[in-house]
From Swiss-Prot:
Keywords: Endoplasmic reticulum, Lipid transport, Lipid-binding, Membrane, Mitochondrion, Mitochondrion outer membrane, Transport
Family as reported in the entry's similarity comment: Belongs to the MDM12 family.
Subunit structure: Component of the ER-mitochondria encounter structure (ERMES) or MDM complex, composed of MMM1, MDM10, MDM12 and MDM34. A MMM1 homodimer associates with one molecule of MDM12 on each side in a pairwise head-to-tail manner, and the SMP-LTD domains of MMM1 and MDM12 generate a continuous hydrophobic tunnel for phospholipid trafficking.
Protein name: Mitochondrial distribution and morphology protein 12
Composition bias type Low complexity, residue spans: 246-258
GO biological process: mitochondrial genome maintenance; mitochondrion-endoplasmic reticulum membrane tethering; phospholipid transport; protein insertion into mitochondrial outer membrane
Pfam families per record: MMM1
Membrane topology reported for the UniProt record: Peripheral membrane protein
Residue ranges annotated for the SMP-LTD domain, each copy included: 1-233
Organism this protein belongs to: Zygosaccharomyces rouxii (strain ATCC 2623 / CBS 732 / NBRC 1130 / NCYC 568 / NRRL Y-229)
Cellular component annotations (GO), alphabetically ordered: endoplasmic reticulum membrane; ERMES complex
Protein's job: Component of the ERMES/MDM complex, which serves as a molecular tether to connect the endoplasmic reticulum (ER) and mitochondria. Components of this complex are involved in the control of mitochondrial shape and protein biogenesis, and function in nonvesicular lipid trafficking between the ER and mitochondria. MDM12 is required for the interaction of the ER-resident membrane protein MMM1 and the outer mitochondrial membrane-resident beta-barrel protein MDM10.
Amino acid sequence: MSFDIHWSNLESDTRLNESIKNHLNTYLESISLPSYVCNLRILDFSLGKTAPNITLREISDPLDELYRGLNEDEPDSITPSPNDIQFLVEVEYKGDLLVTLAADLVLNYPSDNFMTLPVKLTISNVGLHSLCLVAHLSKHLLISFLCDISDVDLDGNESLLDPKGHVLSPRRSLERISIIRNMKIETEIGQQHSGEGSVLRSVGRLEQFLLEIFKDLLRKEVSWPSWIELDFNDDNEEDLQQSKDTPTTANTGTTTTN
């Protein structure tokens, strides 16, 4: 069963895009960069106007592992509720998501940090086709990718995945899931925006490193047994407090009470 998403509401949500950008920057700060790259950060992030195609495959009770994972971080134990639910969905995305990054390329010869060059990277044409879990538990929304799904448009000769079968198995033993199957990276090195110096484009070594960073990020953060967790408890508490502090005004101009 397929269903539509009001993607325009997400795409136009500047707070959501900013939150995703901040999360990615936090991850970039935690990784070890090679000696020739420093100060890697995300300048801009946009979900794009193209929505993913989502197909519902199964509805069930949430896995026990999800409750155990939440209870490790929650002061109050979360127990199964009749309102808890889990969806197994197929997600296909070939859209116009756009990420702009900046970094400094370092030349360490004849001495350390002998020269640095500004680098700008633009990521676009992202493609993925995966099976994932979406679970709702006590005002928590959990999302975890399980495996990649065979896709004629994404399974090229350069794919890290074995195209035999409907669900792909990785050619490299440590890569059971790739999530991002297609991605375009454009690299510019030099003072293009200030109008000084020359600009180098398509620096393959740096582009390959960035590709591996994003694949590692997704595998560590959103592929099973890890997941994305969205907690709505704080938002509800803030809304409740605001409703208590702010009087409600009717159309006639009179103030109504509780």
